[in-house]
């Protein structure tokens, strides 16, 4: 655990180094020290096979990096920062979509790139990982603020990425909106998902929502009841033989 003084120093150091707009941070002493710590954390994670245990370990490690992240986001001017981008990915792996989005706004604004051997561009990576994090949350029966998902779609709307990736995010957004009772919003996202990927697996759900949203026929007024026929009263026949007519 770091002390309050250490966290403050870390935050200030991050802010100072992040203000070097065009200069690479690799020549900053404090940044290099933080990269050494990050590499040690990554080695710890690499030794863990279970994805669930690995996510739990990342959740344990993340608080250490919070002062650095805050310093960059508050005063940074767009210098490439591998620490920041790694923390963004770790936050997604632990289901912290809101925290990752906080970094993504900054990263996409300044065009930061993914560190190391990551082949996906930041918008591509972020969209896909947000979708996967939301899918894991949905599978666990938990909820996600759909505003985070729609903001991600808006933030990466003009970025190039496989259509199937964007379709994943539209699909899970639609499913959460459906669960929240927004049938019209859900239908729009699911329709967009199937436009982007015909194998998105949402056709039956689209049909169900379309039936739900289809206007119900207005109830017809009841037909007027027919007037009951008056039945002629029949005079009961007199008993006995009828009288003979006079001849």
Predicted regions and their residues:
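Structural register within alpha-helical repeat arrays
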Residues: 86-87, 91, 130, 166, ...
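Residue at a conserved register position within TPR or TPR-like alpha-solenoid repeats
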Residues: 72, 90-91, 134, 170, ...
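N-terminal alpha-helical interaction modules that lie
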Residues: 1-81, 105-160, 215, 219-247
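Residue signature of alpha-solenoid helical repeat architecture, marking inter-repeat boundaries
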Residues: 77-78, 121, 162-165, 197, ...
């Amino acid at each position: 655990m770091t002390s309050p003084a250490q966290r403050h120093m870390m935050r200030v150091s991050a802010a100072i180094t992040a203000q070097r707009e065009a200069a690479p941070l690799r020549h900053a002493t404090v940044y290099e020290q933080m990269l050494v710590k990050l590499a040690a954390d990554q080695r710890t994670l690499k030794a863990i096979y279970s994805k669930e245990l690995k996510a739990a370990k990342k959740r344990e490690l993340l608080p250490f990096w919070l002062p650095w992240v805050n310093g960059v986001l508050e005063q940074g001017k767009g210098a490439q920062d591998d620490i920041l981008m790694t923390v963004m990915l770790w936050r997604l792996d632990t289901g912290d979509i809101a925290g990752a989005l906080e970094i993504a706004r900054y990263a996409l604004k300044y065009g930061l790139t993914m560190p190391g051997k990551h082949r996906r561009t930041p918008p591509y990576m972020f969209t896909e990982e947000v979708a996967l994090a939301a899918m894991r949350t949905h599978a666990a029966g938990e909820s996600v603020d759909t505003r985070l998902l729609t903001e991600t779609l808006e933030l990466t709307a003009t970025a190039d990425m496989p259509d199937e990736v964007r379709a994943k995010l539209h699909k899970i957004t639609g499913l959460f909106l459906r669960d929240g009772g927004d049938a019209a919003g859900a239908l729009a996202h699911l329709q967009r998902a199937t436009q982007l990927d015909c194998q998105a697996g949402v056709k039956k759900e689209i049909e169900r929502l379309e039936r739900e949203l289809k206007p119900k026929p207005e109830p017809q007024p009841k037909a007027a009841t027919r007037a009951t026929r008056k039945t002629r009263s029949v005079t009961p026949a007199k008993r006995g033989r009828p009288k003979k007519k006079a001849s």
